[in-house]
Amino acid sequence: MQPSFWHDKWDAQQVGFHLSAVNPLLVKYWPQLELDANAQVFVPLCGKSLDMCFLAEQGHEVLGCELNELAVQQFYRENELAFDISTLAEHQRFHTEQVTIYQGDIFSLDAAEMPNTQAFYDRAALIAWPEEMRSAYARQLAKLVPANSTGLLITLDYPQAELNGPPFAVSDDWVQANLATDFEIERLSSEDVLSENPRFVNKQVSWLTESVYKLIRKG
């Protein structure tokens, strides 16, 4: 999957992955991370997600990373947030009070550029990668977040042969096999959500499960 895939999606505004409200699973499970209100939270592949606004409203400093510049511009514009732009290594840095977004490739982001991160939130990043690229993303996430940082991960799982991603199917077995080296893993919930997702119903996908995990970066 090339960067042009996502740029084309944003250019055409084919952004069905963008939610028009804060993710209810974030609202429900974020308190279980028991973070300090002022903890810095990293949001990989953040798009223009309203979840960043929710995190900022909890008192957190939010640090996102997003490949597409239009998505970043739309986040600030649609939320009526004034911002300034600077350059940091290979990324453009968009900044307003409490929300900073590095625009560019997450694989060229360096942990030195986000030294104060204490937590992370992944709703749409892990499931955005096809299986052949997913492990590389997981390794990069582990490099970026420091030891003992706590995260919330949301995944979808379904029979991949029945529908082309993204979002791609990520099973509990995959999570355990590929993240356990770097993270302590606790599954907080796993629910059947097929009836709530018309795209999957219309494509006659036989089942769809959404899971929530609490992750802690190992030392």
Swiss-Prot record:
- Annotated catalysed reactions: S-adenosyl-L-methionine + a thiopurine = S-adenosyl-L-homocysteine + a thiopurine S-methylether
Q: Does the keyword Methyltransferase apply?
A: yes
Q: Which SUPFAM superfamilies match?
A: S-adenosyl-L-methionine-dependent methyltransferases
Q: Which InterPro entries match?
A: SAM-dependent_MTases_sf, Thiopur_S-MeTfrase_Se/Te_detox, Thiopurine_S-MeTrfase, TPMT
Q: Where in the cell is it found?
A: Cytoplasm
Q: Which Gene Ontology molecular function entries are recorded, alphabetically?
A: thiopurine S-methyltransferase activity
EC identifiers of the protein? 2.1.1.67
Which top EC class applies here?
A: transferase
Keywords of the record: Cytoplasm, Methyltransferase, S-adenosyl-L-methionine, Transferase
Q: Which GO terms describe its cellular component?
A: cytoplasm
* GO BP: any one term: response to metal ion
Give the residues the record marks as binding S-adenosyl-L-methionine.
W10, L45, E66, R123
What the entry lists under Gene3D superfamilies is as follows: Vaccinia Virus protein VP39
Task: Write out the similarity annotation.
Answer: Belongs to the class I-like SAM-binding methyltransferase superfamily. TPMT family.
Q: Give the matching NCBIfam families.
A: PRK13255.1, TMPT_Se_Te
Protein name per its UniProtKB record: Thiopurine S-methyltransferase
What organism is recorded for this protein? Shewanella pealeana (strain ATCC 700345 / ANG-SQ1)
From the broadest rank down, the organism's phylogenetic lineage runs: Bacteria, Pseudomonadati, Pseudomonadota, Gammaproteobacteria, Alteromonadales
